[in-house]
Amino acid sequence: MHHDPASCAGDHESPLDCAVREGGHALVEQLVASGVTRVFGVPGESYLSVIDGLYDHTDDIEIIVTRQEGGAAMAAAAHGALTGEPGICMVTRGPGATNASIGVHVAKQDASPMVLFIGQIPRDHQHRESFQEVNYRQMFGELAKEVIEINTVERVPELTVRALNAAVSGDPGPVVVVLPEDMLVEQTDAPLKSRTTPAPVLPDAHSVQEAHRLLSEAEKPLIILGSTGYAPELGPLVTDYCGRNGIALAAAHRRMHLVDNSSPAYAGTFEFGRSVLENNADEADVIFFLGSRPDPNTGEEWENYRGGAANGQAGPGVIHVYPDPNVIGRFFPAHVGTAASPLEFMRALVEHEGGGSGDGGAAGGGAGDSALADARRAWQKKLHDDWAGYIERNLQTSLGGPFMQKFNARFDAETIITNGAGNYTAWVQKNRTYSTFPSHIASQSGSMGYGIPAALAAALEHRDRTVVTFAGDGCFMMNGQELATMAANNLDVLVIVVNNSLYGTIHMHQEREYPGRPVFTSLDNPDFAALGAAYGARTAKVSTPEEFDAALAEFASAPGLRFIEVVTEGY
C-alpha cells in the first residue's frame, strides 16, 4: 500500500520544502500522510506538542481518549488484529508507559501490528533517575519488535514511517517510539516521507513443490491456519483447497473466525488442554502450519513430534510457512520451512496443483490413487464430525451451553464477539461456530481485561455490525472503566459479564493440584448491573438461560451500551 503525503510532500530522494513547525506537529502530519485514521491514548504533559498537533487534524484522525493506558494499548493491539494495519497508542512517560506495557505484550504474542508512542523526559535530564524516567530500550527490549528513540527533530518523519513499516513487516507486532519532550518542541522543516509498506514475501518454487509432494502423499494431512500474514481472501482460498483435496483444516488457538466452520474440511480449533482435535492431530502424518506458530496451545507438545524433535529430526511431514524466518524451526524441525506470505504461498500451491479436480484433487491422491483419496476423505470427515459432536456436547452439557444456545439463536454470523481470559471464554469458543472474518477477536496471550478494549476497537472500526463482548467477573474488573469510553463515543456494544465470584481458571487449577485447599481465588464483587447503569448502560441481571434469553430479546437490536450480568455457580 502506498500513501502519499497530502502536503509538505517529499521523500528520501527529492525532499520538498516544508513550513517550519514543532516536531510534535511534524509527527502528526506524518501519521496523517501515512494513512493513520485513529489513535488511542491517555494524554500526558510529556508529549503536549503531539497533542497540540492533533488539534489541527481532528478531521483526519479520530482521537479515542481512554481511561487507563492499559485499555488504550489493548485497543490498539485489537485494532491491529482487526485491520492488519498498526494500531496507534499514545501515552506519557513512566506510569503511562508501564501501564501500557500489557498491551505491548498482547500485541507481541498475537503478532498484531501496533505502534506505541511514549513521551519522554527531556534529553538533558536523562540518566539521572529523573522524575518518571525509564530506559525504554531496556524495558521493552523483550516485548517489542523494536524500540526507536527520536533524538533529532529532523528525523521525526523518517523514523515514524520506519516504525509503522516495522510493525507490519515480517512477524507483525509492536514497535515502541520514544519522544523526548524537548525534541518535540524544537522547530523543523523536515519533509514528510512517502510510506510504501513492505511487499509480501513470495515463496520459492522448491518449497511449493515439496509442500505439494508431502500433502499429495499424505493419508492424514492437517493444515493449521493462523492469523499472521492473514488476508480476508486467504480463508476461502485455503478452505476450498482443503475441501477438494481431502485435507483437514484447523484454526490456531482463538482464531476460529479464519475458517468457515461449516465447511466439511473444518476440523476445529486448538485450545487450552487436550480436546478431540488435539487427540486427532496426534494421528496426522503431515501437518502444515500456515501463518501459525506452534505453542503449548497449538501443537507444540504433540506426542508424535517429541521423539523426532528431541533427536534433532523432523517430525512426520512438518511444513511451516510464516512471514518471519526466525520463527521457522523454533519449536521442531520442518521438512519444508519457508519465510513467505501465507496468502502468496497458498496462491502458488493452488497454481502448482493446477486448480484441483476430481476426487481428491491434484493433491489428493498423487497419481490417481483412489484408495488414498478415499482414506483422505474419511480422515477429513472424521475430524469434522468429531469436532461438530464436541461442540454439540458442549452446548448440551457445559455450564455455558444452555446460555449460548439462546445467544446463538439471536446473533448471526456477522456479530463480532470479543473476550479476554478465563474459563468463561469456553462459552464462545466451545459453544459457537464462526463463518465470517472478523467475527471473533481474542488474545492468544491469555491476558485478562482484553475483551472490553477489543470491543471498543471493533465497534469503532465496524459501526455497522453488532459487537458483543464477554467477560468474567475478574476479567471485567481489569478494564471495565473503558465502558466510559464506549459511552463517550456513542458506541453500540453489548457487554455480558459471567459472574461466579471467582478467579475461576486459577481455582480450577488449584483444585486439581491442591484439592480441598482453596485460597486467594474468591472474589467479593460489586453490583455489576448497578455499575453498568452508572456508565449509562441499560442493564439486566439474570441467572437462568430463560432469563438470559429474555434480556437478549430486549437488548439484541437496541442501540447504545447494554449490559447483562449472568450470575453462575461453578467454573
Predicted regions and their residues:
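Phosphate/pyrophosphate-binding active-site segments
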Residues: 2-18, 154, 213, 314-421, ...
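Glycine/aspartate-rich loop-and-adjacent alpha/beta segment that forms the canonical ThDP
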Residues: 2-5, 183-204, 297-298, 303, ...
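Glycine-rich, acidic loop regions that bind phosphate or pyrophosphate groups
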Residues: 8, 118-159, 255-376
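Conformationally flexible catalytic loops at phosphate/diphosphate-handling active centers
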Residues: 11, 162, 166-217, 355
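Active-site diphosphate/adenylate-binding microenvironment
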Residues: 24-34, 42-45, 50-55, 378-462
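A short, small-residue-rich loop immediately preceding and capping a beta-strand
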Residues: 37-40, 61-64, 82-121, 224-227, ...
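Glycine-rich, anion-gripping cofactor-binding loops and their flanking helix/strand elements
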Residues: 81, 227-319, 433-464, 477-481, ...
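Thiamine diphosphate
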Residues: 117, 126-132, 265, 269-272, ...
